[in-house]
């Protein structure tokens, strides 16, 4: 049994714990503690009632001994709540923590990870892109087989790298990619304003519900980290749109082989049934973004939107639940790190 602690109980931290209870991994992973600076009452309430993913299927309570406890079925699973701002003072050693899932979105450097190690954790997995000095960056389904036992401080990439990189790999393996561009159409996030208010990014001073808002992205750097051969070959832009969840990615690539639409789509279908099973899905149904809410795949390719120009320029539409799909990959990578 892998003993896990979650640091940061926001959108991803809560989704990871919920995903564990909806998965077949509860006999492999035990969450023993959550570190979060907010109050236990708010933590329990937000875990029980979620505007995006609905009510948690079991009753959630909190008490003094175990300020957070979840009660599934007839047994009681108890998870310790901590409120420690200093990572090096967390009681990971006494709790015998094997792996910390750092879901704060704040920490991501090797030195941050070392603080968890100093506190007694054996390994750390960041839920966001980390520095180049980390032991590894994993996009599960693409390079998780590169994990080594000595890799202690690892990044799980981002929701968008987990969405687009498996698709890039499938197309590149089949036809060879020369270069590409990506537009990320991302749902609003909590670093945006409800109404116009001050922010260091002037575009993000504007109300999230009123505009499509361009934001900076380093997605191309994430692609280069996994595929060094694509250095200076990809560029990306990103916009936030007034929805609460689910992201669409507009991928355009130039390929070395002359292809037709069916060639591209069949490649994705084949990958979804074999090498990328449970990672990439495929659909041609006339769906919209909300239909992908709570989808556990990293990516869902909408084959009805695939286009090919002049045999070599390929455009694809790829969906993902940027919370739920990524949370499920955190669990997959956690287990891969335990081997």
UniProtKB/Swiss-Prot annotation:
Keywords from the UniProt entry: Cytoplasm, NAD, Oxidoreductase, Pyridoxine biosynthesis
Main location: cytoplasm
Swiss-Prot/TrEMBL GO biological process terms: pyridoxal phosphate biosynthetic process; pyridoxine biosynthetic process
Highest taxon listed in the record's lineage: Bacteria
GO (cellular component) term, any one: cytoplasm
One Pfam family here: Gp_dh_N
Chain residues that bind NAD(+): 11-12, 322
Binding site for substrate: 158-160, 204, 217-218, 240
Positions marked as site (Activates thiol group during catalysis): 186
SUPFAM superfamilies xrefs: Glyceraldehyde-3-phosphate dehydrogenase-like, C-terminal domain, NAD(P)-binding Rossmann-fold domains
Catalytic activity annotation: D-erythrose 4-phosphate + NAD(+) + H2O = 4-phospho-D-erythronate + NADH + 2 H(+)
EC top class named in words: oxidoreductase
Transmembrane segments annotated in the record for this chain: none
Pathway(s) the chain acts in: Cofactor biosynthesis; pyridoxine 5'-phosphate biosynthesis; pyridoxine 5'-phosphate from D-erythrose 4-phosphate: step 1/5
UniProt subunit comment: Homotetramer.
Family annotation (PANTHER family): GLYCERALDEHYDE-3-PHOSPHATE DEHYDROGENASE 2 (PTHR43148)
Role: Catalyzes the NAD-dependent conversion of D-erythrose 4-phosphate to 4-phosphoerythronate.
Name of protein: D-erythrose-4-phosphate dehydrogenase
């Amino acid at each position: 049994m892998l003993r896990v602690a979650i640091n940061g109980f926001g959108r991803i931290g809560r989704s990871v714990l919920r995903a564990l209870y909806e998965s077949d991994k509860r006999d492999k992973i035990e969450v023993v503690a959550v570190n979060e600076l907010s109050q236990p009452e708010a933590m329990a309430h937000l875990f029980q009632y979620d505007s995006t993913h609905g009510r948690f299927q079991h009753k959630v309570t909190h008490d003094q001994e175990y300020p957070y406890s979840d009660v599934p079925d007839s047994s009681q699973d108890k998870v310790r709540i901590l409120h420690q701002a200093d990572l090096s003072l967390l009681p990971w050693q006494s709790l015998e923590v094997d792996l910390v899932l750092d879901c704060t979105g704040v920490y991501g450097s090797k030195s941050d990870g070392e603080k968890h190690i100093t506190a007694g954790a054996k390994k750390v997995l960041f839920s966001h892109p980390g520095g180049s000095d980390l032991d590894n960056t994993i996009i599960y389904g693409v390079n998780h087989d590169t994990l080594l036992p000595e890799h202690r401080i690892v990044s799980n990439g981002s929701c968008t790298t987990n969405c687009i990189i498996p698709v890039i790999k499938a197309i590149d393996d089949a036809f060879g990619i020369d270069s590409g561009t990506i537009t990320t159409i991302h749902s609003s996030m909590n670093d945006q304003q409800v109404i116009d208010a001050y922010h260091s990014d002037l575009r993000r001073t504007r109300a999230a519900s009123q505009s499509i808002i361009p934001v900076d992205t380093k997605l191309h750097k994430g692609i280069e980290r996994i595929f060094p051969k694509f250095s200076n070959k990809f560029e990306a832009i990103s916009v936030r749109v007034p929805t609460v969840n689910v992201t669409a990615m507009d991928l355009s690539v130039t390929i070395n082989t002359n292809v037709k639409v069916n060639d591209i789509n069949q490649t994705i279908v084949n990958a979804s049934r074999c090498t990328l099973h449970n990672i990439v899905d495929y659909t041609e149904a006339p769906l919209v973004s909300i239909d992908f809410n709570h989808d556990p795949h990293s990516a869902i390719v909408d084959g009805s939107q695939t286009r090919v120009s002049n045999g070599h320029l390929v455009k694809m539409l790829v969906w993902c639940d940027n919370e739920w799909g990524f949370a499920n990959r955190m669990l997959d990578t956690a287990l891969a790190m335990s081997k």
